[in-house]
Every structure is written in C-alpha cells, then in structure tokens.
C-alpha cells in the first residue's frame, strides 16, 4: 500500500467529516505532528495502532484508510 494512498484516503475521509487535523489528533490521542505526517505521506511506516486510532477518530474502518 502506497503511503500517499493512505494519506489521500485520510484527507478525503477527514474532509467528509469536516474535521481539522487538530481535531483528529485530539480524538485519536496522537500528536498533531504524527497526524500531519501521515496525511502528507511523510510517515513511511504508520503502525497498525496509529491507523486504528485514526480510523476510530474518523468513525471508519482501517480498511477504509487502506482502500
């Protein structure tokens, strides 16, 4: 799975919810830096824990982030 694809899906799903990066970070209990790096594709190896936290914050499945 391409990191840019994860970032693209993350950005799309976040926009659909109308959430800011700050809100996702807060809901996911992650640092803003982690969230920004994931969405921009800079984070080359997001852990399943990070992906799960993001998915839960967006109320979607991890599969939705990976599609």
What spans do the regions from the language model cover?
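DNA major-groove recognition helix of helix-turn-helix/homeodomain DNA-binding modules
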Residues: 49-64
């Amino acid at each position: 799975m391409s990191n840019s694809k994860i970032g693209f899906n993350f950005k799309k799903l976040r926009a659909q919810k109308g959430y800011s990066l700050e809100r996702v970070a807060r809901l996911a209990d992650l640092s803003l830096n982690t969230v920004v790096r994931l969405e921009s594709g800079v984070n080359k190896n997001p852990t399943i824990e990070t992906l799960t936290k993001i998915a839960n914050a967006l109320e979607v499945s991890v599969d939705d982030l990976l599609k």
